[in-house]
Design a protein with these regions (language model features):
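Histidine-centered active-site/metal-ligand motif
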Residues: 166-167, 182, 356, 414, ...
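Generic structural signal for hydrophobic
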Residues: 131, 154-155, 620
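Hydrophobic helix-and-loop "lid/oligomerization" segment in the mid-to-C-terminal part
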Residues: 2-3, 10-137, 158, 208-429, ...
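Acidic, two-metal ion nucleic-acid-processing modules in DNA metabolism proteins
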Residues: 98, 103, 239-334, 369, ...
Length: 660
C-alpha cells in the first residue's frame, strides 16, 4: 500500500491571473486554475463561452464528401449497410449514434460488434466474409479500421467500405472507399482530439447538412457518454459536445441512458462527467468484458421503455459480476505479490490460470494504485498467457516490453498501457528481465506517486460558493482535470470506516465555524495512521454533499498525511496486555478487522499510543495467533488460531523492529 506521495503545488503567475480576472471577469481561484491549464484570454473565452455554433464544419474532414455520397447512394438503392463497431464504450456509443441516425434516413442498416475474447479488437476477415455472404453492400466502421490495411485489401473488390476511426493512423492507410480520421497526415481538420463516437457524429452531421442544410444535434448525450469514457482531451469540440450532452442527459436524456441512470442510483443527482466515467461507463463496458457489447447497443437504440429497463437491470447485474470477478482476481494477485517478496520490489508481475481476460486490465490499474509499480497481470489458458500492462508516470511500458520482445509471442500498446501474449513457462524469465530493466530506468523517486495540487486553500475558506465558482471549468476530464486543492494544516475531529465492506474512510476536520467531511475511497489503512486529534495536511477535490435538503462542501481525499507521526514503541509487557484485549475482542471466532481495531483503540492501555497498539495486530499475525482473510462478502476478517506452547517474540520481524 502506498503510504507517501510527492506533493507538487503549482506555482503562481500573478500577472497572467490578473489578466484573466480583468479580461474575463473570473474569480481569482478560477483564474489560477486556468493559468495552471495554460489557458490564455482568447482560449479562455472559447473555453468558458463555447457553444454548439462553434462546432467545426464536418466536411473539413478528409474524404467526408466521398463518404456522404456513398451512404446516400446506398440508401437510395435500398442496399444493406452494416456498422462495424467495437466493444468498448466509445465503440458502443459510436455504433448506437450512427445506427439511430441512419434509421432516421430510412436506411436498411444493422450493426456488428466483435466478441472480445474470441475475435478481439477491430476488423477481422472471417466476420467480413460472413457479411459479404449475407449480401451486405456497405460496411461503415466506427472506432476501428485504420490499422486494417491487409484485411480491407482482401475484401475491397467485393464490398464497399468506409473507415471512421480516431486512433493514430499508420503509414499504410487502408484503401477503403473513404477513410475519415482526423489523424491522417493529409487531413487538415483543426481538432485532432475527437473520439470514435465524435468522428461518427461528424459523419451524421455531414449527411444531415447535405439533406436539410441544418446542424444535426440529436443524441448528444450518447456522444458525450462515449467521449468521456474514452478519456480523450475535453477541450475544443469535445468540451462543447460533452457540455451540451450533459445538459441533455440532465433534462431529456436518451431512454436507455435514463434507465441506466436509474439502476445506478443516480436519478436524483445532476449527472457530471465524473458520473459517466465512474458509474455509467463501467456498466456499459461490463457487457463487452463479461457477456457481449451488443446488449449495450440495444439499450441505447431501443424506444421501448420495458426493454430499456430490462437491459439496464441486466447490465447492472453484469457489472456486479464484473466487480466480483475483479475482486477475486485482485485478491489472488495481492497474495501472489506478497509471496514474491523482494521479487516484486521493482515491477509487479502476477499470473493465474483462467483469470478472466476481460478484467485483468482493471486489476492491473488497481495494483498500480496500491503498489505504484509498473504492473503486468497475466491470464493463463492452455499454456499461453495473455497479459495486460499498466504503467506509472514517466515510465514507458511499451519500451519495456520491446526490450523483452524475444520472450514474448506478440505485444502492442503505448507508453501507459499495453498488452501481450507469452508462453506460460517464460513468465518468470519475463519478470527477471523487466526487473533488470526497471532497475536501470526507474529512479527511487519515480516510485513515489505525485499528487499535483492546483492551489492551497485555508480550511476556513472552503464553502459551497467556491464550488459554484470553480464549476465554471466543468466538465472535467483529460487535459482539464478535476481541480485539486490542499489544506496544509487541519485537525481531525473524528475518523471512521464506512461502506458495506468498511473499505472507505471518512475523516471529519475541524474548522473555526464547524466541521468538514472528507472521504477517502478504498483507504481503510488510514484508520491505522490517522486518529482523533491528529494534525494533517490534505489534498482533495471538492464536491457538494446534498442531504435532506441541506447542501454542504465535501472533500474527496487524494492524499492525506499526518504532519507528525506517532512513534511506534513496543514492549513485552505491552504486548501481553494487547494479547488479552485482542483475544477478548475476537471472542473465540472470526471478527472484522475494523471491529477489532475499534476495540483496540477503545481499550488500549493509557501508556500506549494508537499506532503502537494497532501494530500489535501485525505481530500477532506474524506469530500465527491471528490470520487475516477476505470474507465471503469481501470484508477483511481476522480468525483466531489456538497456538500451543510459549510464543517466541523474536520470530516477529515487526517486534524486533520496534521493541524497546
Amino acid at each position: 500500500m502506498i503510504k507517501k506521495k510527492r506533493w507538487r503545488i503549482s506555482t503562481s503567475d500573478k500577472e497572467q491571473e490578473n489578466i484573466l480576472i480583468r479580461e474575463l471577469g473570473v474569480n481569482p481561484i478560477v483564474a489560477k486554475l486556468m493559468v495552471n491549464r495554460h489557458i490564455d484570454v482568447d482560449e479562455g473565452r472559447r473555453f468558458l463561452q463555447g457553444s454548439l455554433s462553434d462546432l467545426l464544419d464536418p466536411f473539413a474532414l478528409k474524404d467526408m464528401d466521398v463518404a456522404v455520397s456513398l451512404v446516400q447512394e446506398t440508401i437510395e438503392k435500398h442496399k444493406p449497410i452494416v456498422i462495424y463497431g467495437d466493444y468498448d464504450v466509445d465503440g458502443i456509443t459510436a455504433t448506437s449514434v450512427l445506427y439511430r441516425f441512419l434509421k432516421k434516413l430510412g436506411a436498411d442498416v444493422t450493426y456488428y460488434i466483435p466478441e472480445r475474447q474470441s475475435e478481439g479488437y477491430g476488423l477481422n476477415l472471417e466476420a467480413l466474409e460472413h457479411l459479404i455472404e449475407q449480401g451486405t453492400a456497405l460496411v461503415i466502421t466506427v472506432d476501428c479500421g485504420i490499422s486494417s490495411y491487409d484485411i480491407v485489401e482482401a475484401v475491397r473488390d467485393r464490398i464497399d467500405m468506409i473507415i471512421t476511426d480516431h486512433h493514430t493512423a499508420p503509414d499504410m492507410i487502408p484503401r477503403a472507399k473513404a477513410v475519415i480520421n482526423h489523424k491522417q497526415k493529409d487531413c487538415h481538420y483543426k481538432d485532432k482530439n475527437l473520439s470514435g463516437v465524435g468522428v461518427a457524429f461528424k459523419l451524421c452531421q455531414a449527411l444531415w447538412l447535405t439533406k436539410t442544410g441544418e446542424w444535426y444535434l440529436d443524441d448528444l448525450d450518447i456522444v458525450a457518454l462515449g467521449t468521456v469514457a474514452d478519456v480523450v482531451p475535453l477541450v475544443g469540440e469535445n468540451r462543447i459536445i460533452v457540455k451540451a450532452g450533459l445538459e441533455k442527459m440532465n433534462s431529456h436524456p436518451n431512454l436507455g441512458i435514463k434507465k441506466l441512470v436509474d439502476v445506478a442510483g443516480l436519478h436524483e443527482r445532476t449527472i457530471t462527467s465524473g458520473h459517466i466515467g465512474f458509474t455509467l461507463a463501467p456498466r456499459l463496458n461490463a457487457a463487452g468484458r463479461v457477456t457481449h457489447a451488443t446488449r449495450a447497443v440495444e439499450l441505447l437504440v431501443t424506444d421501448n421503455a420495458d426493454m430499456a429497463e430490462a437491459i439496464a437491470e441486466e447490465l447492472n447485474e453484469t457489472n456486479r459480476e464484473r466487480q466480483e470477478l475483479e475482486r477475486n482476481i485482485h485478491e489472488l494477485a495481492r497474495i501472489d505479490v506478497a509471496n514474491q517478496g523482494h521479487k516484486a520490489d521493482y515491477v509487479t508481475v502476477v499470473a493465474g490460470e483462467d483469470w478472466h481476460p476481460g478484467v485483468i486490465g482493471i486489476v492491473a490499474s488497481r495494483l498500480v494504485e496500491e503498489f505504484y509499480k509498473p504492473t503486468l497481470v497475466i491470464s493463463i489458458h492452455d499454456g499461453i498467457g495473455k497479459g495486460s500492462c499498466r504503467s506509472i508516470d514517466g515510465f514507458n511500458i511499451y519500451d519495456a516490453l520491446k526490450s523483452c520482445e524475444d520472450v514474448l509471442l506478440q505485444f502492442g500498446g503505448h507508453a501507459a498501457a499495453a498488452g501481450f501474449s507469452i508462453d506460460a513457462d517464460r513468465i518468470d524469465e519475463l519478470r527477471d528481465r523487466l526487473t533488470a530493466y526497471c532497475k536501470a530506468h526507474v529512479t527511487a523517486e519515480e516510485y513515489i506517486p505525485v499528487v499535483a495540487i492546483d492551489a492551497e486553500l485555508p480550511v476556513d475558506d472552503i464553502d459551497v460558493d467556491i464550488i459554484d465558482r470553480v464549476s465554471a471549468l466543468e466538465p472535467y476530464g483529460m487535459a482539464n482535470s478535476t481541480p485539486i486543492f490542499a489544506v496544509m494544516e487541519a485537525t481531525v475531529q473524528d475518523i471512521m470506516l464506512m461502506g458495506q465492506l468498511k473499505n472507505h474512510c471518512k475523516v471529519i476536520l475541524e474548522t473555526s465555524s464547524g466541521t468538514l467531511d472528507a472521504i477517502a475511497w478504498n483507504r481503510p489503512d488510514l484508520f491505522r495512521t490517522i486518529f482523533i486529534g491528529t494534525v494533517v495536511k490534505v489534498a482533495f477535490s471538492l464536491q457538494k454533499n446534498e442531504w435532506q435538503g441541506m447542501v454542504s462542501p465535501q472533500l474527496m481525499i487524494q492524499a492525506i498525511e499526518p504532519l507528525t507521526e506517532e512513534p511506534i514503541t513496543l514492549s513485552t509487557e505491552g504486548l501481553r496486555q494487547m494479547y488479552v484485549i485482542v483475544k477478548q475482542a475476537m471472542r473465540g471466532r472470526s471478527q472484522s478487522v475494523y471491529n477489532v481495531e475499534q476495540e483496540i483503540l477503545r481499550r488500549k492501555p493509557a501508556d500506549q499510543n494508537n499506532r503502537s497498539a494497532l501494530t500489535s495486530l501485525d505481530i500477532f499475525k506474524e506469530l500465527g495467533i491471528i490470520e487475516e482473510y477476505t470474507g465471503d462478502d469481501g470484508q477483511l476478517m481476522l480468525r483466531w488460531n489456538a497456538v500451543e506452547g510459549k510464543l517466541d517474540l523474536v520470530t516477529s520481524v515487526t517486534f524486533l523492529t520496534y521493541s524497546v
